[in-house]
Amino acid sequence: MQSVAFMIDLSIKSLRGILMKQIKRLFQIDPWKIRTTHLDKENLRLQESLTSIGNGYMGMRGNFEEHYSGDHHQGTYLAGVWYPDKTRVGWWKNGYPEYFGKVINAINFIAMDLQIDGQTIDLATTPYEDFSLELDMQNGVLSRQFTIQTPKNKVRFSFERFLSLEKKEAAYIHLTIEMLEGTGTITLHSKLDGDVQNEDSNYEEHFWEEIAIETQETLGFVTTKTIPNNFEIERFTVTAGMRHFIDGASVVPTYTQQPLALTAELTVSLNEGETTAITKEVLVVTSRDVPETQQITRVNELFSEMTTLYPEAKAGQAAAWAKRWQLADVVIEGDDEAQQGIRFNLFQLFSTYYGEDDRLNIGPKGFTGEKYGGATYWDTEAYAVPLYLALAKPEVTKNLLKYRHNQLPQAIHNAQQQGLKGALYPMVTFTGVECHNEWEITFEEIHRNGAIAYAIYNYVNYTGDQDYLKDAGLEVLVAIARFWADRVHFSQRHKQYMIHGVTGPNEYENNINNNWYTNTIAAWVLRYTRESYLKFQEETTLKIADDELAKWADIVENMYFPVDNELGIFVQHDTFLDKDLMPVSDLPLSELPLNQHWSWDKILRSCFIKQADVLQGIYFFNDAFSLEEKRRNFNFYEPMTVHESSLSPSIHAVLAAELGMEEKAVEMYQRTARLDLDNYNNDTEDGLHITSMTGSWLAIVQGFAQMKTDHQQLKFAPFLPATWTAYSFHINYRNRLLFVEVAADQVAFTLLDGPAIPLTVYDQKYTLKDRLVLPIRKEEVHV
């Protein structure tokens, strides 16, 4: 048995040196821009990830428009377009999914290869100067400039591109060419290139086949379709169209067809001091919205609607982003690193998802890479829902819930595959059918089911929308509850219900028994579902027998939760305390991250925790635990946590803030806010950590400002981090819009829209009618 002294010793060990290990910062610090004047060829994949753009309908990595022969990861992705790749495992087990769904690299429509007097421009080999790259987060425009010197001339190229928020199918690529010295002819080969493949494809497999290539004077079209599959899964057809303008005038290029590709050639000759501008407009439609036979017609219709020139389109893009930022922006004064981090994360989140389509969810990588297959995980419900509730209309979050409700039949199928009743929502999915093929995740990481139920509770508690609970949410809850009731077993020896053979949120342990978090959320689901059913029993068509309700109540009353009274903690699972317990700070820095240096066997036997596990449950059910229980568990588990999941730092930031551990809270905020910008986990080159980007917002709003909505009441207890001079944010809550400002000496709440609302600040109750200003409370800071 470990001593209390050991627990306290762990709690005071700092991870500061570990967090600073191998930070890789490619871009300058700027509140609104991601900018560099250095082309880092050794880290171009990382640079491409960090300059990704999207509009919820499609997105792409920050690839160059012109040909680049060096190492890079070309990637353009379309929401909801994927391919079922045959599951490949060494040892097949009953219950495995037949296929692994993966987002597939789609048509490369930004390609604009360049030649100066016949010489191909390739920044991997061509000498260049005056390079700059900038992502402007205020308007979503990615720009890049460079100058090429040849024996005959000196030419400046300036690219801009964006994916339209006003017309989701539209993309704009704008190239300005300046002849600084001499004269010359610039040849542009603008392409729609469907001959692409995934970075992770097996044996260089291609997922697309050509359907049609057409030209209509100024317009060019390429239609491709995903190759047949063996699983009767829908095939997707995609049509991309392009047209070009030179100095605002429409042009008819010279077209050349290749397999799966169309090239439009444009040529301009410039004298010294002359400048020209070429705009490429692209439209992309998919069979998710437009049948294959109607796609070229639809693209033509969309082109006819696009009557503005590039400057007006760019201004419209800026206005659309300004509307989103007006509600979503978090302003931090006194710390530009922190400011850049939160804005970058919010920008990428809203580039990935804004709730327009209830057939879509949020993949962990969004449109920025192919890792994790681009599919949906439980991350959305656990981490993204609180942010979208506060920063968007309720319909946005409701669409996330509809996504899961629509897939309930498939979740029931997943449970049946494991021989269980009810519904088991998948760990990885596009359609609701499980796509993950690792047994310790597919079969055992069943706590994900609880996150789906918790998101329903979170939505109803935050919005007050009882009709959704009655009309749709309850059906999902009942199916999940039936799964848990069947998955538990009754221990005759202990006379309690237990759950064996699971993987908790800490994926650095598999096949464990009685994971505290899993047992806790299972019991909570059964309780919440039972209470909700009894509330609407007379109004719902769902029927639950009295003996089933009684069984649920018995499980809740007699669920086993591992605890240690000497340490005063909830035990992560039955045998966790038998491990060789030590803090992460005792490890050599050269061995971190563990998942890149240790064998999987060594990780599984260690005490080290990938992400919040017990603390995840304390975060979810915060008001069920005393401050002392929170403190003891935080001090015990956090020092053993390596935070090698991007989802981890935010939960620790929120809890540390509540416990008065300001330094730890800020440290965790910095990690979650700049996880990708500083490449903390040394894996951002594979794509951004989109769903965990909500963590920086959670750390500020639920952590530093201590916003809570327990029992349908809005509460705050803000503090100001020592290195900041002020911060502010907006909150949508039950048809009200609030503006919260936290400064060194005061905190202010302004009701910008909606009726008066009860508000609790520092445990004192107020009614917010217009503006409330209070002195900020100076809390005792704990280590």
From Swiss-Prot:
GO MF annotation, one: maltose phosphorylase activity
Enzyme Commission number(s) from the entry: 2.4.1.8
Sequence positions that bind substrate: 378-379, 610-611
Keyword terms, alphabetized: Carbohydrate metabolism, Glycosyltransferase, Transferase
Secreted found in the keyword field: no
Active-site residues, Swiss-Prot/TrEMBL: 507 (proton donor)
Pathway participation: Glycan degradation; maltose degradation
Pfam family, one: Glyco_hydro_65C
Superkingdom of source: Bacteria
GO biological process: maltose catabolic process
Enzyme class, UniProt record, top EC level: transferase
Reaction it catalyzes: D-maltose + phosphate = beta-D-glucose 1-phosphate + D-glucose
UniProt family annotation: Belongs to the glycosyl hydrolase 65 family.
Function per UniProt: Catalyzes the phosphorolysis of maltose, leading to the formation of glucose and glucose 1-P. Does not have maltose 6'-P phosphorylase activity. Plays an important role in the metabolism of maltose taken up via the bacterial phosphotransferase system (PTS).
Protein name (record): Maltose phosphorylase
Gene name of the record: malP
